[in-house]
Amino acid sequence: MVDKHEEITLPIVLSCNYQSDITYPGQKQFDCGNPVIDKFVRASLKKSVRNSDCAAKALIDRQSGELIGICTFTAYSLEKQRVSGVLQGSQPSEIGVVRLVMLGVARKYQKRGFGQDLLCDFFEHVKIIHRALPIKGVYLDADPAAINFYTRLGFVQLSARPNVFGALPMFLAIQHILAA
């Protein structure tokens, strides 16, 4: 019989820059429940980071070294019409942003706040980027199942219609990130 009051022991995790020269335990079996993210993490992440196609933050179990979560991002630009009504004042025709490409936490670690922890670390990285090269915010294409998660973090939908892959474009202005 299981004691309902038994404490669940959460792993002690380390959020760090993903290193393409390391083989992380669990990476080849990574399963966050999203087939696109799973396939990318298992087969393409290492090469994409090595080739500077993206940067990545990793969430690692300190004890086992297991890859718990991943967040990939890259420089990007949006046409100002895409963010009309979201940004104040006059804007150039193209605005610089950081694009959050993929965010995934292994299923067995989901619903424990690790995705939010990984995003908070990502936002700290975005602040550093902004100090070196000012940007207007963070852009992402949200899987429909993740829209509420991103909305709770302050992201707004840029379109009511999903793209051809079923994802909705969302945006978080840099002011919100800097204020956090």
Which residue ranges define each predicted feature?
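Non-catalytic substrate-recognition and accessory regions of acyl/acetyltransferase enzymes
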Residues: 1-112, 117-139, 143, 147-180
